[in-house]
Amino acid sequence: MIKYFVIFFVLLSNANGSDLLNITFLGTGTPRPNLDKLGPSILIKANQEELLIDVGRGTTLRLNQIGNNYSKINNIYLSHMHYDHIIGLADFWLTSNLWQKKTDTNIYGPKGVKKFCDGLMNSYQLDLKYRYEGNNYSKLKCINFSEISINNNKILVTPFTNDHGHVDNSYGFKILFNDKSIVYSGDTTLSKNVVNNAKGTDILIHEIIATSKKVLDNNKKLRKVFKSHTNINQIIKVLNTCKPKLTILNHALLFGVNEEYVLREIKKSYSGNVIFSKDLMSIDLGEEHNIFNIGK
């Protein structure tokens, strides 16, 4: 049974049903395995087009859970080459072929994406031979993007560099459809590019890291990780500058604290709408801006 729970939020707009922009959080987790929070991945739908932002662990399972057979997903955007954002790509690609996907899939990513895709496809040559020898199958077409806009049937996706500490070639994305905008920060610490792209956006999807003082003081490796992500004080600065209509904290690295603590701390210095993402949370940006859960 599919469940829908409208939560809140209405925006004034002249959009009609055919102009609806929808985003669904397939996975909102981190590298740590968690059945309630699978690997990071977001499905974006508008104008009969579907695309993915990142393909973390369990993406294909979540697509199956919402009844999506992958046939319309022809464009995937990878924010960076950390394994937790790309490990689900092989599963998506191979399983989509089982479902007889007719079209190839474009993979847009930073430097290194072509080498990654070549290696991935080579790894499964025996499987492909056994299953599809003499027949056509859907392939991956990997494209190394720079900061350019990519138009997918009126959905405009613009990658921009962020600041993920020691990680080179890390990106966020700005997604435009008609008069609606979504900004996805990617993995980043405080970044001017995120701020500049997110000013006045309808939805800012931003990562967060938060720890207790005790945990941080006693973990040298975590202190290094902490510097590569956006802490509570930094996200407050971002939000007070950007003033997005809605902020969704995503891919949350929480150590010794919980979501309620993070929201309390943010609300001390920022009065806008802030929530945490959940797996299978879906949002319609149209005449009404509705947030609901979808899934079996």
Predicted regions span which residues?
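Cap/insert and terminal regions of metallo-dependent hydrolase folds
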Residues: G172, S181, T189-M281
